[in-house]
A protein has these predicted regions:
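Hydrophobic alpha-helical segments at protein termini of multi-pass membrane proteins
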Residues: 1-258
Length: 258
């Protein structure tokens, strides 16, 4: 397969997603520290909880479940969406509650905000930031001719497989590469909002606020999977934005009561 030029607009989308994935969490960290008076520790607690609950524990459960019932889950979009939403809500919101109940001290609004920035921020860096770096590096190598030279040194099958994998960089619509950054922006906003809801549930001993945090997380993740099967990425992001907006409004209401 001949390598084609990766459009400049696609590379711009990759750069946009990269900047959002790293600059947004850092910006929120600075804002929470300087403007809200939050401590730095909750940010890193949020990062650590995401890594333990999602990267380690949730991923381990996924491996077991897919070994036992992988065909059943992947064979039904609805079942897969419900499963994914339940798992994400269960692990992330439970981790958020435990961390904010026992680790984040003092448990106040600024530190809840900081925790959310860390939890959502490290997710953005790992899921979108790292992928964007890889995409940009590959795109630059393709456009400069370096990648073609490297593929020439491989055996025919491996070179063809690598080229086929890289083809997404020039066949994917340029606008789609911006979607990763938009998705991460919304996700970070959601995590901050959910952290405020969980904070309020602890402060007010409100099961309703905690349940709402679980519910928002479940709904957003499930809808994203369901809509991805039938709609464009931008329709998915629009729906995610609307649900995230609901979480923001609920978190704002919680702040007004503090």
């Amino acid at each position: 397969m001949t390598l084609m030029t990766v459009p400049a607009a696609s590379i711009a989308g990759m750069v946009f997603s990269l900047v959002v994935s790293f600059a947004l969490p850092i910006g929120l960290f600075i804002y929470a520290k300087k403007k809200l008076g939050a401590k730095a520790a909750p940010f890193f607690i949020g990062c650590g909880v995401f890594f333990v609950m999602v990267v380690m524990l949730e991923a381990a459960i996924h491996r077991i479940v897919f070994q036992l019932a992988g065909e059943a889950l992947t064979g039904s979009v609805i079942l897969y969406a419900v499963y994914g939403g339940l798992m994400a809500a269960l692990f992330e919101e439970t981790g958020r509650y435990i961390a904010m109940r026992f680790l984040v001290k003092p448990m106040d609004f600024p530190n809840a905000f900081m925790y959310g920035a860390g939890h959502g921020g490290v997710e953005a860096m790992l899921l979108c930031g790292v992928a964007s770096i890889s995409n940009i590096a590959s795109a630059v190598m393709i456009n400069s001719g370096t990648m073609s030279a490297q593929l020439a040194s491989l055996d025919a099958k491996k070179a063809a497989d690598t080229a086929a994998a890289l083809s997404a960089l020039w066949t994917t619509p340029s606008l789609t590469f911006f979607a990763g950054g938009v998705e991460r922006l919304l996700a970070v906003v959601l995590h901050v909002s959910l952290s405020i809801l969980v904070f309020r549930s602890i402060r007010k001993k409100s099961r309703k606020d905690l349940l709402n945090a679980y519910l928002f997380h479940f709904v957003i993740d499930s809808l994203a999977v369901l809509l991805s099967a039938v709609a464009s990425v931008w329709v998915v992001e629009l729906v995610v934005a609307l649900v995230t907006g609901g979480a923001v409004l609920m978190a704002k209401y919680a702040c007004m009561e503090e």
